[in-house]
Amino acid sequence: MTLRRFIPAALTALVLLGGCTIEPPLHLRKTVATKVVLQTRVSTDILWQINWQTQWDYAWQTELYGPLGYSEPKSMRMHVYTLGDDGLRKAHNTYNFNGTEGTADIFVGYHDMLFHNNNSEVLLFRSDDDLSDINAYTRIISSGLKTSMPVLTLEQKAMATKADDETEIEESVTFMPDELFTLYKPNYYISDNLDDYEYIDGKYVLRIQGELRPATFIWLIQVKFVNNYDRVIGSMGGAAITGMSYGVNMTTGLTEEMAVSVPMDVHMNKSVDPDMMGARVLSFGIPGCNPYDDASVAAAPQGRHWFVLNVNFSTGTYKNIRIDVTDQIRALPTGGVITLEVDVDDFPPEITDPPVSGGGGFNPIMNEWEEEVGSTTIIY
């Protein structure tokens, strides 16, 4: 039996398929009744291309905002695609595991196997039909972002970068996805030969080894305000990253080419540093590429990435600003820390700024919310 190795990544998984003592022997059965146990280990140090522990300065409050890094998945879903003699998929069975254990009846023969965590209320899964690859995505919640003012960082000003006043951000806004981990084992053979199994405590056990890899990536964004003098006091509307992928094919790892904006909460801990904001955002990454493949990232469709930020002033008004973060996102396709230094004198509060509103349903950064419509098959 050949096990196909995957490139090592942050989350290593060991899958053991076992069941009760099998009678009659395996070779007399058409299916193998098994128990699946998923054991995982998370190593955040190698998930991001830079070490957030040394680059991240914002005083993040885990007890209020949750963890910065990845969490180990607590429940899993297993898709088994049975292959015919022609190598094409003929059947599709799905098994959900409470926690990390469950049972499965698998036909002897070749199968494509897909594992992913299923403990999210935000992630949705769709395919063209029951035998097609599955894409993960999130719902569209707004037709787009509201108008924002372009602002250069101190680094961009030093490089004499010209602010782009003409850019129009014309893309939908989606829910921010939760953490998603996937493992794909194509053309895997379930044998009827007992020699291919271990016999442990009265059970035949099949071990499947591989790496669960993140399919959504974490960016930590910190904004440092120069010449603030208590003018910027918070962000009621939060922020959004533009130009990110709408979803991902969990089999191939390729992100969808459709670009969307992903919103996030923004925090300001004034008792620690009144001149800094911090945010954490998850996304499927750069559209139209495999984020783990440098060549694929380099060949991805060109696009702009803006960090659109709502800032509240001590005058009781607010302003939406946008900062070009294309270079940072493209340099960190699997996530990382982005630090932005901006001068408040470049976007000071003005009499014409709209007043901060606390009205129900009002969002200063995005247009009215809307529900997604479509005809694709949604898999639950």
PLM feature spans:
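Acidic/polar, low-complexity intrinsically disordered N-terminal segments immediately downstream
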Residues: 21-145, 332-380
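Beta-strand secondary-structure signal
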Residues: 33-39, 112-114, 207-209, 218-222, ...
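Short, low-hydrophobicity acidic/polar segments
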Residues: 87-212
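Tryptophan-paired
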Residues: 70-126, 232-332
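A sequence/structural signal for flexible, mid-protein segments enriched
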Residues: 167, 171-270
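C-terminal motif of bacterial Sec signal peptides marking the signal peptidase cleavage site
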Residues: 16-19
